[in-house]
Amino acid sequence: MMKNLLSVLLIFSMSVVTDETKDIAYIYSYDNTNQIVMNIEAALARAQASQGIIPEWAAEEITKKAEVRYMPKTEVDAENEFVRHRLVSRLNVWKRSLDNGAEEYLHYGATTVDIFDTVLVLQIKASLGILIDDLIEIENLLLKLTKDNIETYMAGRTIGQHALPITFGKKTSTWLAENRRNIERLK
């Protein structure tokens, strides 16, 4: 139980995106996906080492080499032609850079689904942060639009027909409220 909790805490404390790379395309890019895979594998190795499952030196070596430069796309693509497995090809290339037998402990006890599900969750989590920032920007624009049009009259609508007059500010205030609810749901 403790080791599962430790693994979860290590993995979900990882940052997937930085201020310099606040871009949805970057979050799902090949290099960033590989870096997240490496971060997860390194976190798993550290958690396992802390519980005595793998040697500490192996976890240190895996963590030290958890950089995307040790998983070049050309080598991964070539390896994938041979093994036809999206994670095995990545791990095989990365293992070649590990020293002192640490490659034996890379991906120890994990499954492809464990790794790629965690990658996806971290990418979605990072994407939500960007989406929330965008919705807050929209909220500020809607607030200005609402204030600027508080006395701008327009025809109300009901079931596709004109209804009693309302203000455009009233109409945009409903968009503002809906946008705020969406922000709260995403948080």
Enumerate the language-model features and the residues they cover.
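Sec-dependent N-terminal signal peptides
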Residues: 4-13
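A helix-coil-helix interface module used to build multimeric assemblies
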Residues: 15-187
